[in-house]
Structure formats: C-alpha cells, structure tokens
C-alpha cells in the first residue's frame, strides 16, 4: 500500500545549487605594477560578477539584466594627442565645447573715464607710499642717532673709569657736576 502525502505529487528534480561568491584577487603585489593588466583584470571581474548575477536572478529580472549587459557599449578610445599639429577650431570645440583658443581672448574694452581714475589712484598710491617711506626713514635715523649717542656716552664713561687719575680738572665743582650727570644718565 503506497503512502499518500502532499509531497508525493512533487516533481523529481534536484534542488538548485547556489554558486559560492568568488574571491577577488588583490593586485597589490609589488611584482605586478603594470597598470594595464590590473585594469583589464578588474573589468573582467566586473563582467564575471554581472554574468553570475544574471544566472542567479529568477523570473522577470533575468531578462532585464541580460538586456542591460547587451546594451552597454564599450568605452570610446580617445584619439592620440597630436604632437605639434594645430587642429581647426571646429575639431577642438567638438571635443570640448568649453575650450577656447588663446588667440581669441582679448582684454575687455576700458572707457576713458576709468583710465583717468586708475592714473589718479596710482598717483595717490605712490604719494601715500612715499610719505610712509619718508616716515620710516626718519624713524630709523632717530633710532640710529640714539644708539650712536648711547655708544658715545658708554665710551666716554669707560674712558673716564679707566683713566682715573690722569685728567686735570680746573674746577672741582665742574667735576662733581659731570659725575652727577653720568650717574643720572646711567640710572635712566
């Protein structure tokens, strides 16, 4: 007596096995520095992945992905750069419509009134710069005179201290006055 079950009517087909995801090779190897080969291998991996996706998809999605793969066109190759050859304007604009020749660019027209203002502004700028330079020169002269005067005072003091008994003073009051001035100048 055969057993009756819900599964008895099921077809005798093998279950669909899913493919394991393939591991990508890393192209970071020091020996493999050729960029052309690495680019081709990466594009091949992408193609393999898209083919695997097409096989794994079920139902209506399968036909859509196949059509997308067929519709994609290979990238257009760029023409090699011409060496010293001048191309007509139409060709350069066809390649890049935003590019312009260097000879086509001209400076914008300047009105006479604007030209006058630039000249007067430049005169004013030079006059103000000259005043500023004169001020700086005067400041530097004053600083130089002060340092020179300090050096002279220091030299006179050193001479006076080193030659303690050699100077003959006519008046003792004059000697005390000079010593007092030296002491006050050193304190400042």
Swiss-Prot record:
Disulfide bonds: none
Bias (Basic and acidic residues) ranges: 59-79
An example Gene Ontology CC term for this record: cytoplasm
Membrane disposition: Peripheral membrane protein
Phosphoserine carried by residues: 87, 106, 111
Biased composition (Low complexity): 29-44, 112-128
Residue ranges of the region described as Disordered: 1-128
Assigned keywords, A-Z: Coiled coil, Cytoplasm, Membrane, mRNA transport, Nuclear pore complex, Nucleus, Phosphoprotein, Protein transport, Translocation, Transport
Tree of life domain: Eukaryota
GO biological process, one term: mRNA export from nucleus
Record carries keyword Protease: no
Coiled-coil residue windows: 119-164
Gene Ontology MF terms in the entry: protein-containing complex binding
Subcellular location: Cytoplasm; Nucleus, Nuclear pore complex; Nucleus membrane
Basic residues: compositionally biased ranges: 18-28
InterPro entries membership: mRNA_transport_factor_GFD1
Subunit structure: Interacts with GLE1, NUP42, NAB2, ZDS1 and probably DBP5. Forms a complex with GLE1 and NAB2.
Function as written in the Swiss-Prot or TrEMBL entry: High-copy suppressor of mutant alleles of ATP-dependent RNA helicase DBP5, which is involved in mRNA export from the nucleus. It may also play an important role in a late stage of NAB2-mRNA export.
Note: Present with 2733 molecules/cell in log phase SD medium.
Annotated protein name in UniProt: mRNA transport factor GFD1
Lineage: Eukaryota, Fungi, Dikarya, Ascomycota, Saccharomycotina
Gene: GFD1
């Amino acid at each position: 007596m055969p057993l009756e079950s819900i599964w008895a009517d099921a077809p005798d087909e093998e279950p669909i096995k899913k493919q394991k995801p393939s591991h990508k090779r890393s192209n970071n190897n020091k020996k493999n520095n050729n960029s052309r080969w690495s680019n081709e291998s990466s594009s091949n991996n992408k193609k393999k992945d898209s083919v695997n996706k097409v096989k794994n998809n079920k139902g209506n999605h399968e036909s859509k992905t196949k059509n997308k793969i067929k519709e994609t066109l290979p990238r257009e190759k760029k023409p090699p750069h011409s060496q010293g050859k001048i191309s007509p304007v139409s060709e350069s604009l066809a390649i890049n419509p935003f590019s312009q020749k260097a000879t086509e660019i001209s400076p914008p027209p300047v009105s006479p009134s604007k030209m006058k203002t630039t000249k007067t502004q430049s005169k004013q700028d030079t006059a103000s710069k000259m005043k500023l330079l004169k001020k700086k020169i005067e400041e530097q002269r004053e600083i130089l005179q002060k340092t020179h005067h300090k050096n002279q005072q220091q030299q006179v003091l050193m001479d006076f201290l080193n030659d303690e008994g050699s100077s003959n003073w006519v008046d003792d009051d004059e000697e005390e006055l000079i010593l007092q001035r030296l002491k006050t100048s050193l304190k400042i």
